[in-house]
Amino acid sequence: VLFRSVMNEGRIQQIGTPQDIYNEPKNAFVADFIGESNIIDGIMHEDRVVGMYGKKFPCLDGGFQPNEPVDVVIRPEDIDIVPVEQGQLTGTVTEVTFKGMHYDIIVDFKGFKWLIQTTDFSPVGARIGVKIDPDGFHIMKKSRYSGMFGDYSSYSSEYDELNEGPEEGNEDEE
């Protein structure tokens, strides 16, 4: 078994297999470092029940204090788009980018932007529902990195900046 470590400023943040680090990041820094994530403030009501946006969701995590504030990590590929009436949450599509094998869809949920990666197209302006299975929620204790990476509100105007590339002139022109 091959173990890896994720470090920040000379300090080990997490040691584990690549799969363990990806699927169960220990803090917001690790979650952001290893890939795109939606990181949302939540409350762990009890073992296997997390709250966000005033709603309760089943999850697989436990070992937290009742009503403990937590960071909830939801990977973009773990979110399913469903009809509004079937959604655990509903939001509005604000951006759609075709990526070849999938779409990157930015959805506004009560002022917070989430990234969803899906093969299903939804047009800008559409009201959609989303469904997240219990194993799609990854619950982390709050840490000094909490809030540094957004309520993946990094998927607002920052997303455009990431996709635009350098603003210099066309290098092919002479």
PLM features: residue spans?
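Compositionally biased, intrinsically disordered low-complexity segments
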Residues: 1-2, 135
